[in-house]
From Swiss-Prot:
<protein>
    <recommendedName>
        <fullName>tRNA (guanine(26)-N(2))-dimethyltransferase</fullName>
        <ecNumber>2.1.1.216</ecNumber>
    </recommendedName>
</protein>
<dbReference type="GO" id="GO:0002940">
    <property type="term" value="P:tRNA N2-guanine methylation"/>
</dbReference>
<dbReference type="InterPro" id="IPR042296">
    <property type="entry name" value="tRNA_met_Trm1_C"/>
</dbReference>
<feature type="binding site">
    <location>
        <position position="254"/>
    </location>
    <ligand>
        <name>Zn(2+)</name>
    </ligand>
</feature>
<keyword id="KW-0949">S-adenosyl-L-methionine</keyword>
<feature type="domain" description="Trm1 methyltransferase">
    <location>
        <begin position="4"/>
        <end position="383"/>
    </location>
</feature>
<feature type="binding site">
    <location>
        <position position="41"/>
    </location>
    <ligand>
        <name>S-adenosyl-L-methionine</name>
    </ligand>
</feature>
<comment type="similarity">
    <text>Belongs to the class I-like SAM-binding methyltransferase superfamily. Trm1 family.</text>
</comment>
<dbReference type="InterPro" id="IPR002905">
    <property type="entry name" value="Trm1"/>
</dbReference>
<feature type="binding site">
    <location>
        <position position="251"/>
    </location>
    <ligand>
        <name>Zn(2+)</name>
    </ligand>
</feature>
<keyword id="KW-0862">Zinc</keyword>
<feature type="binding site">
    <location>
        <position position="274"/>
    </location>
    <ligand>
        <name>Zn(2+)</name>
    </ligand>
</feature>
<dbReference type="GO" id="GO:0160104">
    <property type="term" value="F:tRNA (guanine(26)-N2)-dimethyltransferase activity"/>
</dbReference>
<feature type="binding site">
    <location>
        <position position="78"/>
    </location>
    <ligand>
        <name>S-adenosyl-L-methionine</name>
    </ligand>
</feature>
<feature type="binding site">
    <location>
        <position position="123"/>
    </location>
    <ligand>
        <name>S-adenosyl-L-methionine</name>
    </ligand>
</feature>
<dbReference type="InterPro" id="IPR029063">
    <property type="entry name" value="SAM-dependent_MTases_sf"/>
</dbReference>
<keyword id="KW-0489">Methyltransferase</keyword>
Length: 388
């Protein structure tokens, strides 16, 4: 295995050089390393550091006693950065024997023998055998087969990545139903649909083990969904989390969307805005997908660490923090296309909605998306007025 040395943050590792004649080199290498996920890993360092500070303020723990596991480590870059840049004990696991050997080599390169260890086990077996304060599930594809074990092992925070956005977002409907036990819809807000389906699956898995979960930070970036969830033991927390579950109604004729809370509820088929037949997605998470206070703590950690993607990360976290807690965003371009209207600047639209007496905000999902409590008819009136 021919390798090269790369640096992320303050961590130096050896990674395999993939063949030059393949479409997606990272997946063709003997051990997976994707440089495009450095932004994800930078945010992970900041979010984990922020949570560790919370954990140490609440529990009688020393920093070196906090235990983190990366269940799918590959080169070990994610777990090594946590050990070296956050300063907690990191377990890096991978079933691939070449990955296992490379992780051990990279531990030595960084002098982290006292703070890090490599294991070679099936991820579900490891997570059923041991408990960790922070469990990180970042597989190649869907995390669904590992959520039960992850919910069992997580004693403080569960961090989850999903790259199977087509099933999550409704593009591959049956696959999404099989993996997440939820019906997604492929709408203009499909990225948020995927996030809420994933959060709903996590909430249900935690509840099975009499645990609740509270989303601290979630974002959809490029081809993946990423969430950081505080895991809270006890039936009270489990029941409270399930109260944020429900269904989303969508009218393909007029664009109406609305939440219906509850796992066993009566849902009218007719759109309350235009009377047409609606489509239903769920069950999914309808509560907030981030905690503004935690977002501020992550922003502080981003400033404190030397990171290559710092400015991009800060922009994502700031947008997440400032979004309204109203499920399912609108896309200005989709509405403009329906109306035959010209799009205006997104900030101009936000201000016009606020001037009309409504709440409104941008979102991190796209540059043309926004949230508002305005009825769909009022949104269209305002967009038409701005279009002239």
């Amino acid at each position: 295995m021919i390798c090269r040395t790369i640096v992320e943050g303050t961590t130096k590792i050896s990674v395999p050089i993939p063949p030059p004649d393949v479409n997606f080199p990272p997946s063709a290498a003997p051990v997976f390393y994707n440089p495009e996920m450095e932004l994800n890993r930078d945010i992970n360092v900041a979010a984990t550091a922020a949570f560790v500070k919370r954990l140490l303020s609440r529990k009688d723990l020393k920093r070196e006693e906090v235990r983190y596991v990366d269940a799918f480590s590959a080169s070990g870059i994610r777990g090594l950065r946590i050990a070296g840049e956050v300063g907690i004990h990191s377990t890096m696991n991978d079933w691939n024997p070449e990955a296992f050997e490379l992780i051990k080599e990279n531990i030595k390169i960084n002098g982290l023998e006292e703070k890090a260890q490599a294991t070679r086990k099936n991820a579900n077996v490891l997570l059923h055998e041991q408990k960790f304060h922070i469990v990180d599930v970042d597989p190649f594809g869907t995390p669904a087969p590992y959520l039960d074990a992850a919910a069992t092992a997580a004693q403080g925070m569960l961090s989850v990545t999903a790259t199977d956005t087509a099933p999550l977002c409704g593009a591959h409907l049956n696959s999404g139903i099989r993996k997440y036990a939820a019906v997604p819809l492929n709408t203009e807000y499909h990225s948020e649909m995927g996030l809420r389906v994933l959060l709903g699956a996590c909430a249900r898995e935690c509840a099975k083990h009499e645990k609740g979960m509270l989303p601290l930070l979630s974002h959809v970036t490029r081809h993946y969904v990423r969430s950081y969830l505080e895991v809270l033991p006890g039936t009270k927390h489990a029941d409270r989390a399930l109260k944020s579950m429900g269904f989303s109604i969508y009218c393909p004729k007029c664009g109406f969307r609305g939440p219906v809370y509850g796992l066993a509820v009566h849902i009218e088929k007719e759109c309350p805005a235009c009377g047409a037949l609606t489509k239903i997605a769920g069950p999914l998470w309808l509560g907030p997908f981030r905690e503004p206070k935690f977002c501020n703590e992550v922003l502080s950690e981003l400033e404190a660490h030397p990171l290559n993607t710092k400015e991009k990360a800060k922009k994502i976290i700031t947008f997440c923090r400032d979004e309204l807690d109203i499920p399912m965003f609108y896309d200005q371009h989709v509405i403009c296309k329906e109306l035959g209207a010209s799009a205006t600047g997104i900030e101009t639209l936000i201000e016009a909605l606020k001037a009309g007496g409504f709440e409104a905000s941008r979102t991190h999902f796209s540059g043309t998306s926004f949230r508002t409590d305005a009825p769909i008819a009022e949104i269209k009136k305002i967009i038409q007025a701005l279009s002239g």
